[in-house]
C-alpha cells in the first residue's frame, strides 16, 4: 500500500521549484545583460562575472573534449533520482534532511538544464580577497553546498527519542 505523498519528504519538492526559478532566473539575467567575461562590482570582494564552465566544480575536466557534458549530466540525473527516493522514504516531518535533499536536487537540475541547453554551466558569482579569487560559481552551486552542509549538520544533531518521533 502506498503512503500519501504529503506525508513523505516529497512534500518539500516546492523548494526544488523555488531554487530552479531563482537559479535559472539569475542565469537568464546574466545571459541577457553580460558579454562573456564582463564583470560588475557589487560589494568589496564580490563581483558579478559572466563565465562559462564546461566541467564540474572548479572547472574540473573542463578541457576534456566534450564527453564530460554527458558524464556530469548522468551524475546529476542519478543523484536526483536517489535523493527523490530518499525523500519518498522519509517522513515530511524530517525537515532538515528533506530541505537539504530539495536544495541539492534544485541545484543539480539548474546546472543540468544549463549543460543540456547551452553545453556549459553559466557561472556569475566571483568572490575575492585582494588578488585571490575563489572559483566563479552560481546559485545552483550555492544550493548544492548549503544542502550538503545541512546533511553534515544533521549528522551532528542529537537523534529524537522514540517518544519525540511518535
From Swiss-Prot:
What domain of life? Bacteria
User: What cellular component GO annotations does this protein have?
Assistant: plasma membrane
- Any idea which residues are catalytic in this one? 123, 141
EC number, as in UniProt: 3.4.23.36
The record describes its membrane topology as: Multi-pass membrane protein
Name the UniProt key words of this record, in alphabetical order: Aspartyl protease, Cell inner membrane, Cell membrane, Hydrolase, Membrane, Protease, Transmembrane, Transmembrane helix
GO MF annotation: an example: endopeptidase activity
Give the function comment from the record. Answer: This protein specifically catalyzes the removal of signal peptides from prolipoproteins.
- Record-given protein name: Lipoprotein signal peptidase
Q: Which organism is it from?
A: Salmonella typhimurium (strain LT2 / SGSC1412 / ATCC 700720)
Which lineage is the organism of this entry classified under, starting from the top rank?
Bacteria, Pseudomonadati, Pseudomonadota, Gammaproteobacteria, Enterobacterales
Amino acid at each position: 500500500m502506498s503512503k500519501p505523498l504529503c506525508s513523505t519528504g516529497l512534500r518539500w519538492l516546492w523548494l526544488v521549484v523555488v531554487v530552479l526559478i531563482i537559479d535559472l532566473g539569475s542565469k537568464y539575467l546574466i545571459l541577457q545583460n553580460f558579454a562573456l567575461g564582463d564583470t560588475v562590482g557589487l560589494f568589496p570582494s564580490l563581483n558579478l562575472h559572466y563565465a562559462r564552465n564546461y566541467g564540474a566544480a572548479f572547472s574540473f575536466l573542463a578541457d576534456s573534449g566534450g564527453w564530460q557534458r554527458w558524464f556530469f549530466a548522468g551524475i546529476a540525473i542519478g543523484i536526483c533520482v536517489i535523493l527523490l527516493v530518499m525523500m519518498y522514504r522519509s517522513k515530511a516531518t524530517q525537515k532538515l534532511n528533506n530541505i537539504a535533499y530539495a536544495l541539492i536536487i534544485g541545484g543539480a537540475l539548474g546546472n543540468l538544464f544549463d549543460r543540456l541547453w547551452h553545453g556549459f554551466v553559466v557561472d556569475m558569482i566571483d568572490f575575492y580577497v585582494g588578488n585571490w579569487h575563489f572559483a566563479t560559481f552560481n546559485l545552483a552551486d550555492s544550493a548544492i553546498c548549503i544542502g550538503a552542509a545541512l546533511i553534515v549538520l544533521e549528522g551532528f544533531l542529537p537523534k529524537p527519542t522514540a517518544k519525540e518521533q511518535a
